[in-house]
Design a protein with these regions (language model features):
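N-terminal helix-turn-helix DNA-binding module of bacterial transcription factors
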Residues: 1-64, 334
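Alpha-helical recognition/docking segments in bacterial nutrient-uptake
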Residues: 1-3, 61, 65-175, 236
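Hydrophobic structural packing positions in well-ordered secondary structure
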Residues: 11, 22, 40, 66, ...
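Generic beta-sheet signal
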Residues: 35, 147-151, 164, 270-272, ...
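Glycine-rich phosphate-binding loop signature in dinucleotide/nucleotide-binding domains
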Residues: 47, 119-121, 180-181, 235-241
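Hinge/beta->alpha junction and helix N-cap segments in small-molecule ligand-binding domains
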Residues: 53, 71-80, 99-108, 162-172, ...
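Flexible loop/turn connectors
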Residues: 237-244, 248-337
Length: 337
């Protein structure tokens, strides 16, 4: 068996019976012959299957529920999008079940939460945050419609994607920094996840477009404040003095700004996502606004459309066009190279 919690489908396959018969054994065993009941019960014991009482109650009550998986709970952007999604889905008459995902080594959301929500027989699943682009997701979802928000994935048969145009977003960042006289622009990356890879690639292309390929420098960090702080602190300790830091997201930028402050060094800093903290006066971070309101509304509508028209031919990917919010953090006069 794969390294995951066995499902009623696994029990049925192991026992050589239908899923409905397994359900009947669990709900009303007196209606099943002793021979077939014993076969199902043996499979349940061998596989270690535990009936999901919540799922059975959902099915029995015919409730309309949608599961929302949240990754990177430390990032306010995820919560901002989730709140808009909740409002939209509840207004459409659905219950919303939230699940907090475990992030492994910065790789993004795994499949365990998707599997658990599918077992609950939800009508659809919406994932907020970076998600691995792997075939295992399709297996975990089964036939459940799903929308991935802010993800580096491509839409598949029963999925759709709502994301930010990172190519334009990082283009705006580099254009702004170059226009301010910065040529040595270091990218503080978001780690090894799919969104981090997209933004790093966009940084490379934007630098090349400005004829700055020789000035390209990437510092491996991560999506958290601590990761940004440690990466920039190590960069400065090595004796390097970048004119500007284009960071993966706002939290990473906050950490970068802290490292610069502690070292007594000035450099232009930009973030990405424009979370509410970025506008505070003492921070005043220049950031790419990914419009969490529009993204949340668009992703909820996309999921509802996918649920109602699973075989329909329509655009299964929407991209929000970002804008750059310029604040004091990027207005630092560049040092001479």
């Amino acid at each position: 068996m794969p390294n995951r919690r066995p499902t009623i489908r696994d029990v049925a396959k192991h026992a050589g019976v239908s899923k409905s018969l397994v359900s009947l054994v669990l709900s009303d065993p007196s209606k099943v012959s002793s021979l077939r009941r014993s076969r199902v019960e043996d499979s349940i014991r061998e596989l270690g299957y535990q009936p999901n009482l919540a799922a059975r109650s959902l099915v029995a009550e015919n409730r309309h529920a949608i599961g929302v998986v949240l990754g990177e709970l430390h990032n306010p952007w995820v919560l901002e999008v989730a709140e808009v999604v909740r409002e939209q889905l509840q207004a459409a008459g659905f219950d919303v079940l939230f699940s907090a995902a475990a992030i492994h080594d910065g790789q993004g959301i795994g499949t365990a939460e998707l599997q658990a929500l599918r077992d609950l027989r939800v009508s659809g699943i919406l994932v907020v945050g970076s998600a691995d682009d792997a075939a295992s997701f399709e297996s975990a979802l089964g036939e459940t419609p799903a929308v991935f928000v802010g993800s580096g994935r491509e839409p598949q048969a029963n999925t759709a994607v709502a994301s930010i145009d990172d190519e334009q977003g990082f283009g705006l960042v580099i254009d702004h920094l170059v226009s301010g006289g910065n040529g040595q622009i270091t990218h503080v990356s978001g780690g090894s996840g799919p969104v981090a890879a997209l933004r790093e690639a966009a940084y490379h292309r934007a630098m090349q477009r400005h004829g700055l390929r020789e000035q390209v420098q990437v510092v491996e960090a991560g999506p958290s404040l601590q990761a940004g702080y440690e990466a920039v602190a190590q960069l400065l300790a090595s004796g390097k003095r970048p004119q500007a830091l284009a960071c993966f997201n706002d939290l990473c930028a906050f950490g970068a700004m802290q490292a610069l402050d502690e070292a007594g060094i000035s450099a232009a800093v930009t973030g990405y996502d424009n979370i509410s903290l970025s506008s505070l006066g003492r921070i005043s971070l220049t950031s790419v606004d990914s419009d969490s309101q529009d993204l949340g509304r668009g992703s909820a509508r996309l999921l509802l459309h996918l649920m109602r028209n699973p075989e329909g031919k329509f655009a299964r990917q929407i991209k929000i066009l970002p804008r750059l919010i310029v604040r004091a953090s990027s207005e630092v006069p560049p040092r001479s190279l």
